[in-house]
């Protein structure tokens, strides 16, 4: 079968934009509500969000999650947004309420930080119908308990150790959806994909 040519239109004014590494297209992707997502931009910068070709946005930032911020990001984005709802300093009832609010705003999923308790993951899963995404920062974490608590996807963010963590998770849980940081270049991205990541977060 011959490969079909894909017509491209970049325009003039929008031609200057951020293009993610093409090798990300090699991962399987994760299908959410009928949309297949392979590349996820890690940013809350509205100018970048409007000028990047990622399939989705992950809006996690080092401050207490605020509905006004998630609403702004979701409102400006042309692609699905995964919203951080805490799990460290912000947790418990507040994280549960933030998850409900994020779903009502149109988020495609909620992301919880590594320190969050399994109890709160379960409580969030009970009240939202969008994916609950648990952040994994070490292969020493109890992955099984996260999944059993209700985490639908795993978000692996282990810096240089990310491929190793992904590989270990994939060996134990062949079917769990994994999104993972791809690192600074195509070599590290491909290593993460070959380790078993279904989607790549990029910053």
Question: Language-model features: where?
Answer:
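Hydrophobic faces of well-ordered beta-strands that scaffold small-molecule active sites
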Residues: 28-36, 56-59, 81-85, 110-112, ...
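Active-site-adjacent beta->alpha loops and helix N-cap segments on the catalytic face
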Residues: 61-78, 90-95, 113-129, 139-143, ...
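Catalytic cores of alpha/beta
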Residues: 93-102, 141-149, 184-202
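Alpha/beta catalytic cores of nucleotide-metabolism and tRNA/nucleoside-modifying enzymes
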Residues: 2-16, 28, 179, 185-203
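Glycine-rich phosphate-binding active-site loops on the catalytic face of alpha/beta enzymes
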Residues: 105-116, 152-165, 195-203
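Conserved N-terminal beta1-alpha1 strand-loop-helix module at the mouth
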Residues: 1-83, 87-93, 104
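Glycine- and small hydrophobic-enriched segments that form the cores of compact globular domains
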Residues: 83, 101, 108-114, 124
């Amino acid at each position: 079968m011959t490969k079909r040519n894909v017509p491209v239109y970049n325009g003039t004014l929008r031609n200057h934009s951020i293009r993610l590494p093409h090798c990300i297209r090699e991962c399987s992707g994760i299908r959410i509500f009928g949309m297949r997502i392979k590349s996820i931009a890690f940013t809350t910068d509205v100018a970048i969000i409007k000028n990047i070709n990622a399939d989705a946005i992950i809006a996690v930032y080092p401050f207490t999650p605020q509905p006004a911020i998630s609403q702004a990001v979701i409102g400006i984005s042309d692609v699905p947004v995964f919203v951080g709802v805490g799990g460290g300093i912000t947790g418990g009832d507040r994280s549960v309420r933030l998850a409900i609010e994020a779903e009502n705003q149109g988020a495609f999923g909620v992301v919880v930080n590594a320190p969050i308790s399994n109890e709160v993951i379960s409580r969030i899963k009970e009240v939202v119908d969008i994916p609950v995404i648990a952040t994994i920062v070490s292969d020493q974490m109890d992955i099984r308990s996260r999944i059993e608590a209700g985490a639908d996807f795993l978000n692996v963010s282990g810096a240089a150790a990310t491929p190793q963590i992904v590989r270990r998770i994939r060996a134990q849980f062949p079917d769990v959806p994994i999104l993972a940081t791809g690192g600074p270049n195509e070599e590290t991205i491909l290593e993460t994909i070959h380790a078993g990541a279904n989607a790549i977060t990029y910053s």
